[in-house]
Amino acid sequence: MPMLAFALSFYFSLSTAFYFHVGEREEKCIIEDIPSDTLVTGTFKTQQWDFRRQDFLESAPGLGMFVTVTTYNDEVLLSKLYGPQGRFYFTSHSPGEHIICLESNSTRLVSFGGSKLRIHLEIRVGQHDLDAAIAQAKDKVNEVSFKLEHLIEQIEQIVKEQNYQRDREENFRMISEDTNSNVLWWAFAQTLIFIAIGIFQMKSLKNFFIAKKLV
């Protein structure tokens, strides 16, 4: 994988915005000299070349951008896949040069027409602004909210399954009680029938004996 690197000099606490062209799946890296314990904010937007219009589109739908940040000691500070546009943050742990690399994750073959992507990039070094803090807080809140919603859905599903099992057990209990009640009444009815038959047979037998003058 080719790696095209170019060094840019930035003043501390300044924001620099620029754009560059790359081919799909081509990696472009920026070298930053950053003091220690410094927040760095990067904002990027990807535009895709349209052959029919012979111009860049406003966005690159379906395309992702893989952002990695490393030091010259090979310490990885950031490695994350974003969409066609996004914002990333990292904090330097030690002073020195840091390498910020961007690479699209397109699976299509690079066309013969040259660079087909335009990447707008803005780097802010040493700006602990409120927007960055709010964005980081929102990311954490969104992550927690997503996990909480997923947990609530699981709890609701468990409650539904418990209610379903409870209903089944209640129906089974009612059916069992009805069956037992029917069996009991049928046994009682059979007993009455047997008693009635016995009384009838005894009376018939007595009448027979009387008729035959045996008693």
From Swiss-Prot:
Which GO cellular component terms, listed alphabetically, does the Swiss-Prot or TrEMBL entry include?
Answer: COPII-coated ER to Golgi transport vesicle; endoplasmic reticulum; endoplasmic reticulum membrane; endoplasmic reticulum-Golgi intermediate compartment; Golgi apparatus
Output this protein's name: Transmembrane emp24 domain-containing protein 11
Q: Where are the transmembrane segments?
A: 168-185
Question: Motif COPII vesicle coat-binding: which ranges?
Answer: 208-209
UniProt keyword terms in alphabetical order: Coiled coil, Endoplasmic reticulum, Glycoprotein, Membrane, Signal, Transmembrane, Transmembrane helix
- Give the family per the record: Belongs to the EMP24/GP25L family.
Q: Does the keyword Transmembrane apply?
A: yes
Membrane topology of this protein:
Single-pass type I membrane protein
User: Which intervals hold domain GOLD?
Assistant: 27-125
Q: Which residues form the signal peptide?
A: 1-17
Single GO BP term: intracellular protein transport
